[in-house]
From Swiss-Prot:
Protein name in UniProt: Protein transport protein sec31
Protein location: Cytoplasmic vesicle, COPII-coated vesicle membrane; Endoplasmic reticulum membrane
Self-association state and partner proteins as the record states: The COPII coat is composed of at least 5 proteins: the sec23/24 complex, the sec13/31 complex, and the protein sar1. sec13 and sec31 make a 2:2 tetramer that forms the edge element of the COPII outer coat. The tetramer self-assembles in multiple copies to form the complete polyhedral cage. Interacts (via WD 8) with sec13.
Basic and acidic residues composition bias: residue spans: 495-504
Record-level Gene Ontology MF annotations: structural molecule activity
Record's compositionally biased regions (Polar residues): 805-818, 873-883
Segments of this protein annotated with the region Disordered: 487-510, 801-1158
InterPro entries: SEC31-like, WD40/YVTN_repeat-like_dom_sf, WD40_repeat_dom_sf, WD40_rpt
């Protein structure tokens, strides 16, 4: 708990009443010696200044007045005539003094209300009545007990007679429910209940042998319950009494090491009690259950008084004889001093930790197991993500049981309705009807125009539709009408009056004259038709190519045409400015001549009509000139030209350029009416990034306009409708134009960043209304690297998460239910290895010492690995180390090759290696069957201080720690002696197994079958190799014991050619029996190889039959006098396996990448990372290193999941189950699964497994 303030006084104290900022009144403690040996006694008032965050400043009294004597007790009541109340002091000289708190604070000289000396001796205790603040009870020496009325302070009356008792009244307390009931405690051990109304004793309790009473306190809610304490150092007890059975206490609280001096029962929560005493400690209890929650920081002298704040029970104060009154709170568990010391100790290395860590002072680090009653809410509600409201209420009033209700909630019902309607319309695919509906419902001209343009883009010929939308429909009819108005198509215009002639002007007159001139020659109509006659036709109109009257230009053109040199003829015609002749020649000369003629024509017409420049741009395919230089008042005509003539590759960019010009015009002229025209250009060019900016600007303006004119709608509803309209336009536009976002893979600088922000906002809105799939759909349109989108996507995934189905497995599943039936019996003929040395004399069968994490064992049977080839059996003892590395020894010399089981089909031979010798100080352990796993701590377990407070209050002992010779402190000594003579029985006793630590053990995963002594037990590890049994009667020397190789993994190749799981063992191809001897002598196994607690325990009995393995011929029994020679083996790897074509390595992703975690493993990442963040945010700073290490190891696991390596499918499924158990706070199940994976799948475990273990422990300890 946090110490907020300190008052540097050895004094009794009282809290100020009322809800104002808390003050404390202190009176110099009678009989106490001050640090400066001053004998001054006074009453002081202190303002704690709790609103200030600076707790280092020393407090100064705000009021002070001298007294004639020291104080034994103080009381402060909220009296009606005084705004700050009245302070009463119980003085050592027997005087009862009353002060006006207001006048004390103001410094008035008449602050003393009265001074009364009715008591003949010292007043030991006093208290105001909680129901009637004018009544004051005082008790003191010689059993004197007075009741005073502030309205008539000079006439108190006494309870009891003077001759009744002569013992001192040490304490008293008014009943909190019945105003006229008072209890007193005396030095003679009498606890007396008084009825003030009748002025008589109601009941007397015998305080367990008339032990002196130091404090009494009534239950704040139950009027018949009270608590008493004794100040005796030999018997520091607190008794809980129920007056309905006053013969004996209901409960006894034991926790203090010396006499209890003060009690304070929290008036707001009857489950909280403070006690302080001569052991310098202040304890917090639950008096209803007798549970001690913990202790507050220990001081250096007696704590003689402790009190809750009457108005705000978050605060309490404790006075001690070390010269301080500490004001503390129950809302935190660490002090600044403790945090600084913890950080200092965190930096200590292994060399000086034990030398310096004991200087750490005792601090309080407990937390209340449940919220105090004043913080409990009878009901509550919270909005949940995904359109849910979670409400909590009491099942029954007065009981702590609650019910939780989750109900759907929508801020605006129209949001869900419009979203659903739009999504259904999209599924139907009728985009045109959507556009028509939205256009008819548009609230502004801009919005209506946008939907019309989008509707035009849906048609089969979007450009033609855009031209029609621009108003250029029926061009042919319009041109014909205009020509008709000019009179060019009417013959009767020749003679139809003056008005027609005047309208045509001079051009019309010339036309009429020429027409009438040629009408007189009817043969002219057949001229051209005559020229098109057949090859043999002749005409009666002869002509001369050269008649002598030609100009040089005519001759040059004629000669060039005769020779087919159209380019030369064109040059002559252009030089002579004969444009009509030039175009005719260019037509005959081909495209090059046509382009040359056109270029010359346009160069000569620079000052001609405007249509000439337009025609030049069209002919020259240079519409950029029109886009950049045409007047913006004619943007519609420019847009029509683009829709008609622009190339498909340039059309979008031309439209964008025209829109950019219009946007620039908007900025220059502030004419927002052009915004609709720019939107048209951007829509026609499919430039989503440009039109979105305009739409968002229109959204803000329309929203603001709607808010100003709205009467019933809320601002949220208006904003959501506008946002919905924007999303609908963008969605339809993307589908119509088949828009492809090419920037989703970028990390930043997105062109559509404004749209992405709206997508995220819209996803949040629809998710709030319960449409999670719709939200996911739009979040998928946002780049993966967008920071806000990543957060939103994680929220959606968590809200949409379902139980991940487990992958189908080909292996036998691991059973987690207890198994109580016996295992199948093994064959009576054990398989024998190909070669073994003679065995030692038989000895009593033994079992390995207790392994708390090993599976349960059977006496005469052993489960079978259905995927392991038949192998010989051997007995291998294990040490008592529960934390040894997996796989037996941690070190194997180079070249060492343990004996291998025979390959399939070979005839096994008799004989086997004997068991390794035991150390001289060991004896066989007794056969024991365990049904529950013990909770033994490991070297990497969570520090003890993380979950429970330190038990010693004096500090760490200075005794030097014992030398640790092993990195695993509980590891047994290694075997160091040679083998005993054959047949030598063990003579000395084995060391005892260390007891398990305190704590509840996890439930057993497999119940051990019945033990049948004296047969050995064997661990039920389905992945371990079958053990070997020792033969009998051999007289040869005993070779060093081999380590038992693990069987092949059930996920690898079939048992005929499996790669060995032991990296030091040869491949299976080299394990076949060979008639030749090996040229290399066998290397002995490493000494002192401690067996792993997770490998199978040995046994002398054969294993049960393997129902999945090929049958093995019965072994032939060889003579026991001599073993056959060893068969040759090779240490080289298998040629077949080494030459086997390697599969392509899976892709490796960088550390920290989580985007490739498969769906079935995603719950592991999400749950564990979320729980790790919860622990990280609440863990004390002294455990920062452990928390960061656990987080680093979990990231290793997440990297494996992201790369889909190391962990097999069944392990992934089990880890998902473990994660769900942690999420449900089912830590026993999580721990059981963790032990199972660590025991049976060690090859998949790594550094990450330690992080999972630490997270389980930290999560359990974190509230």
């Amino acid at each position: 708990m946090v110490r907020l303030r300190e008052i540097p006084r050895t004094a009794t104290f009282a809290w100020s009443p009322g809800a104002a900022s808390p003050l404390i009144a202190t009176g110099t403690r009678a009989g106490a010696v001050d640090v400066d040996f001053s004998n001054e006694t006074c009453l002081e008032l202190w303002d704690l200044g709790l609103s200030s965050q600076d707790a280092s400043q020393e407090l100064q009294p705000i009021a002070k007045i001298g007294t004639d004597s020291g104080f034994n007790d103080l009381a402060w009541t909220d009296y009606e005539d005084n705004s700050r109340g009245v302070i009463a002091g119980a003085l050592e000289n027997g005087s009862l003094d009353l002060w006006d708190a207001d006048k004390l604070i103001n410094g008035s000289s008449d602050a003393v209300i009265s001074r009364m000396t009715k008591h003949s001796g010292a007043i030991k205790a006093l208290q105001f009545n909680p129901k009637h603040s004018n009544l004051l009870a005082t008790g003191g020496a010689k059993g004197e007990l007075y009741i005073s009325d502030l309205n008539n302070i000079t006439n108190p009356y006494r309870l009891g007679s003077a001759a009744a008792r002569a013992d001192d009244i040490e304490c008293l307390d008014w009943n909190k429910k019945v105003a006229h009931i008072l209890v007193t405690g005396s030095s003679a051990g009498f606890v007396t209940v008084w009825d003030v109304k009748t002025r008589k004793e109601s009941l007397t309790l015998n305080n367990m042998g008339r032990k002196a009473v130091s404090a009494v306190a009534w239950d704040p809610e139950k009027p018949t319950k009270l608590i008493t304490s004794t100040p005796l150092e030999s018997d520091p007890l607190i008794y809980v009494w129920d007056l309905r059975n006053s013969h004996a206490p209901e409960r006894t609280l034991k926790g203090h090491e010396s006499g209890v001096l003060s009690l304070s029962w929290c008036p707001q929560d009857p489950d909280l009690l403070l006690s302080s005493g001569k052991d310098n400690r202040t304890l917090c209890w639950n008096p209803q259950t007798g549970q001690a929650y913990g202790e507050f920081p220990v001081v250096t002298n007696w704590t003689f008084q402790t009190r809750w704040n009457p108005h705000n029970p978050n605060f309490f104060a404790t006075a001690s004889f070390d010269g301080r009154i500490s004001i503390q709170t129950v809302q935190n568990t660490r002090t600044d001093t403790a945090r600084a010391i913890a950080d200092q100790n965190q930096a200590l290395d292994g060399a000086d930790f034990f030398a310096k860590a004991q200087t750490q002072p005792q601090v309080s680090n407990f937390s209340l197991p449940k919220a105090p009653k004043w913080l409990e809410r009878p009901c509550g509600a919270s909005f949940g993500f995904g359109g849910r409201v979670i409400s909590v209420s009491l099942i029954e009033k007065g009981k702590r049981a609650s019910k939780i209700k989750i109900t759907p909630f929508e801020v605006d019902e129209t949001v869900a309705k419009s979203t659903e309607t739009f999504e259904n319309a999209l599924k139907e695919g009728d985009l045109r009807s959507i556009c028509e509906t939205r256009a008819s419902q548009a609230a502004s001209d801009e919005e209506k125009a946008d939907w019309k343009v989008i509707e035009a883009l849906i048609s089969e010929n979007p450009r033609k539709s855009l031209i029609e939308y621009l108003g250029f429909q029926d061009q042919d009819d319009e041109t014909a009408d205009k020509l008709a108005q000019l009179g060019l198509n009417k013959e009767e215009d020749e003679v139809n009056g003056k008005s027609a002639k005047e309208s045509r002007g001079s051009g019309a007159k010339k036309h009429k004259r020429l027409q009438s001139m040629f009408d007189a020659n009817p043969e002219a109509d057949n001229f051209l038709s005559d020229l098109a006659a057949s090859k043999g036709a002749k005409t009666n109109n002869p002509f001369q190519i050269f008649n002598g009257s030609e100009t040089e230009a005519d001759k040059g053109i004629t000669r060039a045409l005769l020779l087919g040199n159209f380019e030369k003829a064109l040059d002559v015609a252009l030089k002579e400015d004969r444009m009509s002749d030039a175009f005719m020649i260019a037509i005959c000369g081909g495209q090059k001549c046509i382009e040359k003629a056109q270029e010359h024509y346009f160069s000569k017409q620079t000052d001609g009509p405007n249509y000439i420049r337009l025609l030049a741009s069209i002919v020259g395919k240079n519409l950029w000139d029109v886009v950049h230089n045409a007047d913006l008042s004619n943007w519609r005509e420019v847009m029509a030209a683009l829709c008609t003539f622009a190339d498909d590759n340039e059309f979008a960019d031309l439209c964008e350029a025209l829109g950019d010009r219009l946007e620039e015009q908007i900025r220059n002229t502030k004419d927002k009416s052009l915004r609709k025209d720019a939107s048209f250009c951007f829509l026609a060019g499919s430039k989503l990034e440009k039109v979105v900016a305009i739409w968002i600007e229109e959204l803000r303006e329309n929203e603001q306009r709607s808010i100003e004119t709205a009467t019933d709608d809320t601002s949220f509803s208006i904003h959501v409708r506008a946002l919905q309209s924007l999303i609908e336009k963008v969605t339809i536009f993307r589908q119509v134009t088949n828009f492809q976002d090419t920037e989703r893979t970028k990390d930043a600088d997105w062109k559509l960043s404004m749209l992405y922000d709206k997508y995220i906002e819209y996803a949040d809105v629809v998710a709030t209304h319960g449409r999670l799939q719709v939200a996911q759909k739009y979040l998928d349109l946002v780049p993966e690297k967008h920071p806000e989108a990543e957060i939103a996507r994680n929220r959606i995934k968590l809200a949409m998460r379902h139980a991940t189905p487990q992958r189908s497995q080909q292996t036998v599943p691991t059973t987690r239910t207890p198994v109580n039936k016996p295992l199948p019996q093994a064959s009576m003929y054990p398989a024998q290895p190909a070669f073994s040395a003679p065995a030692a004399a038989p000895a009593a069968a033994t079992t390995a010492p207790r392994n708390p994490y090993a599976p349960p064992t059977a006496a005469t049977t052993q489960p079978v690995n259905p995927y392991t080839p038949p192998s010989a059996a051997a007995t291998q003892p294990q040490t008592s180390n529960s934390y040894a590395p997996i796989g037996g020894g941690g070190y194997t010399p180079a070249g060492y090759q343990p004996p291998q089981p025979p390959t399939y089909g070979t005839q096994p031979l008799g004989g086997s290696v004997p068991p390794p010798p035991r150390a001289s100080n060991q004896s066989p352990a007794t056969v024991t069957t365990y049904t529950t796993a013990t909770n033994l701590p490991a070297w990497n377990d969570l520090p003890e201080g993380f979950t429970k407070p330190p038990t010693s209050r004096r500090g760490t002992s200075a005794t030097a720690a014992a030398t640790i010779s092993s990195p695993f402190p509980n590891q047994s000594p290694t075997l160091s002696q040679g083998p005993p003579p054959p047949g030598a029985p063990p003579t000395q006793r084995a060391p005892s197994v260390p007891p398990p630590p305190k704590g509840t053990a996890p439930p057993p995963r497999v119940t051990s079958p019945p033990t049948n002594p004296p047969g050995p037990s064997s661990a039920a590890n389905p992945y371990a190799s079958l053990p070997q049994s020792p033969p009998m009667g051999s007289t040869m020397g005993v070779p060093p014991p081999p380590s038992i190789p693990r069987g092949p993994s059930p996920y690898n190749a079939p048992p005929s050619m499996p790669p060995p799981s032991n990296r030091y063992a040869p491949s299976p191809a080299t394990q076949a029996a060979s008639p030749q001897l090996s040229t290399r002598a066998p290397v002995p196994p490493p000494p002192h190889a401690a067996a792993s607690p997770y490998t199978s325990q040995p046994g002398s009995h054969p294993p049960p039959a393997n129902p999945y393995a090929p049958s093995t011929p019965p072994p032939s029994q060889l003579p026991m006098q001599q073993a056959p020679p060893p068969q040759a083996t090779s240490s080289r790897p298998s040629t077949a396996s080494s030459q086997r074509k390697a599969a392509p390595a899976p892709p490796k992703y960088p550390p920290g990448d989580r985007s490739h975690i498969p769906a079935d493993a995603m719950p592991i990442y999400e749950i564990l990372s979320a729980d790790m963040q919860r622990v990280k945010s609440r863990a004390p700073s002294s455990f920062k290193a452990q928390v960061e290490d656990a987080e680093r190891r979990l990231n290793i696991l997440f990297d494996h999941l992201n790369n889909e390596d190391l962990l097999k499918p069944n392990t992934v499924a089990d880890m998902a189950e473990l994660a769900r158990a942690i999420q449900a706070r089912d830590y026993e199940t999580a721990k059981t699964i963790h032990i199972d994976i660590m025991t049976n799948r060690t090859e998949e475990c790594g550094n990450w497994m330690v992080g999972v273990k630490r997270l389980i422990s930290m999560s359990r300890a974190t509230p």
